[in-house]
Design a protein with these regions (language model features):
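A compact, surface-exposed functional segment
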Residues: 208
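Conserved phosphate/anionic-ligand binding catalytic regions in large, soluble enzymes, centered on
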Residues: 48-65, 69, 189-205
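Generic beta-strand or strand-like secondary-structure segments
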Residues: 36-39, 43, 60-63, 67, ...
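Phosphate-rich cofactor/ligand-interacting catalytic cores and adjacent structured alpha/beta frameworks
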Residues: 1-26, 30-31, 55, 68-184, ...
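Active-site cofactor/substrate anionic-group-binding motifs, chiefly glycine-
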Residues: 28-48
């Protein structure tokens, strides 16, 4: 994976995220929203030659955008809508995420959505007073990242959590260098905290309409 590949993926997914939002605003049910999400996933794989660049992010963005549509139409709480919508979706079968959930008893992106995005909401509060790198490290220390479990098992996931927590405990002026060293180690181990990156992206592309305490 490299930056051009990620940019191609983003270009392929952007119109579909708009489509999912529009469907929700029109009152589409969960089945129609999920069908659009699957078409978006297919568009991503076509753009990347079969590489999974944003599958987890697509799920989280789609659920939250669809929940925002319901909130704008019906009122209530965005995150309650997100949790309800996630529960209405047909669970995937035979994916890396479902295998990780079975083997390690962790839920990943689906569990986060079903709970109303509690980790993302806490991270949004932190982003009020901390830079994105610090928030990313906090997410790495607290997120049950199925991508890490898939690639490195429980040991790999624990390693990333421990290292991120250690960097957060270090003097702030050392964090960039320590993070760069951790990045090198993760590349060597073929570990990617993609779930944490997805949640940070969700925050950086959201507004105070979604996260009331978050006003960038």
């Amino acid at each position: 994976m490299d930056l051009p590949l990620f940019l191609r993926s983003i270009d392929a997914l952007t119109p579909w995220l708009r489509r999912i939002t529009a469907l929700s605003l029109s009152g589409a049910d969960a089945a129609a929203l999920q069908a659009a999400g699957l078409e978006a996933e297919a568009a991503m794989f076509r753009a990347t030659g079969g590489v999974n660049t944003h599958k987890g992010a697509l799920f989280s963005f789609s659920v939250l955008l669809a929940a925002l549509g319901r909130y704008l139409m019906e009122g209530g709480d965005v995150f309650a809508h997100a949790a309800a919508l996630a529960a209405e979706l047909t669970p995937p079968r035979d994916t890396h995420g479902t295998e990780v959930a079975r083997r390690h008893q962790v839920g990943g992106a689906r569990a986060e959505a079903l709970a109303g995005f509690p980790t993302a909401r806490k991270a949004a509060e932190l982003l009020q007073t901390h830079d994105p790198l610090t928030v990313l490290l906090w997410l790495m220390a607290h997120t049950e990242d199925t991508n890490l479990y898939h690639r490195g098992g429980a040991e790999g996931a624990a390693f990333v959590k421990e290292q991120a927590a250690a960097i957060l405990a270090a003097p702030p002026e050392q964090r960039v260098a320590l993070t760069q060293a951790l990045d090198d180690a993760l590349i060597e181990c073929r570990l990617s905290p993609g779930g944490s990156a997805d949640l940070l992206a969700l925050l950086l592309n959201s507004s105070s309409t979604v996260f009331p305490s978050f006003d960038r």
